[in-house]
Amino acid sequence: MSISLLGRIVSQQFSGIRAAEPGRSLYLPFTLLLKQPGAYKVSLHRYVHSTQTKSHLSFLMNNNDITPFQKFTVKVLKEQCKSRGLKLSGRKSDLLQRLITHDSCSNKKSSVKINEPKKKRILINDPIKITKKLVSDKTFRTIEKNISSLQNTPVIETPCDVHSHLQPRDRIFLLGFFMLSCLWWNLEPQESKPTIDH
């Protein structure tokens, strides 16, 4: 079947719907629904990338300059991530996403007001007179507390204090080490002697 014959068959079956001709657009049944008032317009453009080339997204930098999104370079984004202590690897979109989320989180944190309890101010009208007796009594009490706290701490015994003698496995290890070092020491002079061949 040729394309022109196929086009005639389709045009006869769907009245009011034009068939595809070479170089012409194809009208499908759902296009009639879209032509009704109140229907949404649908554009059938194929985008190569998921992001548009021009974006009107603005971003607030550290120095409070609003810079357009398309003027950012990867180097600038990495410097901004480094200054904020964020991860430096990834694509440009990843870096932007990290910066935007970090700034939005930091703006939320800064907008939250922390209620600190008010400190009570003590007004002293009469200064306190300190005598030598008060000072000496105070130092004696602190020394007494320190000594009692030292006496209350448990004494931890180390393994050397508990077992002053060698364990059987320690004796076997030391004996084996001593024997190997003696054998090695005896073999060393025999290797260094020159041999005379007749």
Swiss-Prot record:
<comment type="similarity">
    <text>Belongs to the AIM34 family.</text>
</comment>
<dbReference type="GO" id="GO:0005739">
    <property type="term" value="C:mitochondrion"/>
</dbReference>
<keyword id="KW-0472">Membrane</keyword>
<keyword id="KW-0809">Transit peptide</keyword>
<dbReference type="GO" id="GO:0031966">
    <property type="term" value="C:mitochondrial membrane"/>
</dbReference>
<keyword id="KW-0496">Mitochondrion</keyword>
<feature type="domain" description="SAP">
    <location>
        <begin position="69"/>
        <end position="103"/>
    </location>
</feature>
<dbReference type="InterPro" id="IPR003034">
    <property type="entry name" value="SAP_dom"/>
</dbReference>
<keyword id="KW-1133">Transmembrane helix</keyword>
<feature type="transmembrane region" description="Helical">
    <location>
        <begin position="172"/>
        <end position="187"/>
    </location>
</feature>
<dbReference type="Pfam" id="PF02037">
    <property type="entry name" value="SAP"/>
</dbReference>
<dbReference type="InterPro" id="IPR036361">
    <property type="entry name" value="SAP_dom_sf"/>
</dbReference>
<protein>
    <recommendedName>
        <fullName>Altered inheritance of mitochondria protein 34, mitochondrial</fullName>
    </recommendedName>
</protein>
<keyword id="KW-0812">Transmembrane</keyword>
<feature type="transit peptide" description="Mitochondrion">
    <location>
        <begin position="1"/>
        <end position="55"/>
    </location>
</feature>
